[in-house]
Amino acid sequence: MTTDINELDLNKTYSYADYLTWQFQEKLELIKGKIFKMSPAPSTNHQRISMELAGILYNFFKPHQCNLFSAPFDVRLIDKRKSTLDQDIFTVVQPDLCVICDETKIDERGAI
C-alpha cells in the first residue's frame, strides 16, 4: 500500500490494480496509465451548477431506469481488446456527474 504520492514515479504507467493500493489525500485520475492530480474542492458556483444539472438529469433519466452518480465515483474505461481485469484497466476517472443505464456496468467499486 502506498500512502504518499511522492513515492510514485509519475513517468511510469499504472493500472487500476495499482490505483487500488494507493491511500493518499490527493485525489487523482488515471488516463492511459498516467497519473493526473485532480483539483482540490470545486468552487461554490461549480457545486451549484453540478447540483442543478444533477436534478435535471435525474428527472430526465428516472423513467428510463438509469442511475445518476456524482463524484467521487470511479468510472473505469476499458480497452475492448483487453480484459476487464484490474491489471488491464489503465483509465479511471471521476466525472462530476455520471449516468449509467446498463446495470451490468455498475459494481461495488463504481462503473466499468
Regions found by a protein language model. Name each.
Residues 1-112:
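Gly/Pro/Ser/Thr-rich low-complexity, intrinsically disordered segments predominantly at protein N-termini
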